[in-house]
Amino acid sequence: MPNIKSAKKDLRRSRAAAVRNRAQRSALRTAVKKARVATAAAADHLTAVSLLDRAARKGLIHRNAAARVKSRLAKQAAASAA
């Protein structure tokens, strides 16, 4: 356990951020799974893409990881539409 006041505050902030990040990452994964399962639901695809962009912008996931998932979702959506 930290003894210094600033270290205690840093630990509090770190724990709060971890909880927040866990919730956002869970919502992101859920949206991506819904988009994969949905055959022709454009709304699910757009929601997943929006969440991926936001997560990459905030540093929750790497921007290349977001681009990779978006690319695979688009490829799958195009294949199911054709």
Swiss-Prot record:
Identify the stretch(es) annotated as Disordered.
Answer: 1-29
Which InterPro entries does this entry report, sorted A to Z? Ribosomal_bS20, Ribosomal_bS20_sf
Q: Bias regions of kind Low complexity — which residues?
A: 16-29
| A Pfam cross-reference name | Ribosomal_S20p
Q: What is an annotated GO biological process for this record, any one?
A: translation
GO molecular function terms noted in the UniProt entry: small ribosomal subunit rRNA binding; structural constituent of ribosome
The protein's UniProt keywords, in alphabetical order, are:
Ribonucleoprotein, Ribosomal protein, RNA-binding, rRNA-binding
GO cellular component terms, semicolon-separated: cytosol; small ribosomal subunit
Q: What does this protein do?
A: Binds directly to 16S ribosomal RNA.
Q: Which family does it belong to?
A: Belongs to the bacterial ribosomal protein bS20 family.
Specify the protein name: Small ribosomal subunit protein bS20
- What does UniProt list as this organism's lineage? Bacteria, Pseudomonadati, Gemmatimonadota, Gemmatimonadia, Gemmatimonadales
